[in-house]
């Protein structure tokens, strides 16, 4: 009986060690990397994010916010797109190590509806990689 219990405990411990490589590193400071040039990258991938290169009457952008997620630390930037008279649509864009890793229509956990926004001239930012 004791041998079986020891075998089960040993198996669980070894299984836990092999799983550790699949989990993100939440403690490392460089997982998210430095703040990306998000305005430039979003301007060049706007069609992928919104589905249309110029889909709105107004387009606004928030500042980059560092967040922790299941994929590890990342930067979140929110976009507010409005085509009048329809209600605005919010999009969340995620960056890690200077690369865009994900984008989606904003969900409640992204908190894009409560962010502060500024006007976004994506045509001007498309050619200037120095803007953040």
Each language-model region and where it sits:
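Cystatin/cathelin-like cysteine-protease inhibitor module
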Residues: 18-132
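Sec-dependent bacterial lipoprotein signal peptides
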Residues: 1-17
């Amino acid at each position: 009986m004791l041998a079986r219990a020891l075998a089960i405990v040993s198996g669980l411990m070894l299984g836990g060690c092999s799983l550790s490589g699949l989990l993100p590193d939440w403690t490392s400071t460089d997982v998210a990397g430095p703040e990306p040039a998000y305005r430039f990258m979003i301007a060049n991938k706007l069609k992928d994010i919104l589905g249309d290169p110029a889909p709105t009457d107004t387009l606004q952008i928030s500042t980059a916010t560092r967040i922790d997620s299941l994929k590890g630390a990342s930067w979140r930037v929110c976009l507010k797109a409005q085509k009048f008279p329809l209600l605005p649509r919010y999009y969340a864009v995620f960056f890690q190590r200077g690369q865009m890793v994900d984008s989606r229509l904003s969900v409640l956990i992204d908190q894009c509806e409560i962010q502060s926004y500024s006007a976004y001239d994506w045509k001007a930012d498309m050619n200037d990689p120095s803007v953040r």
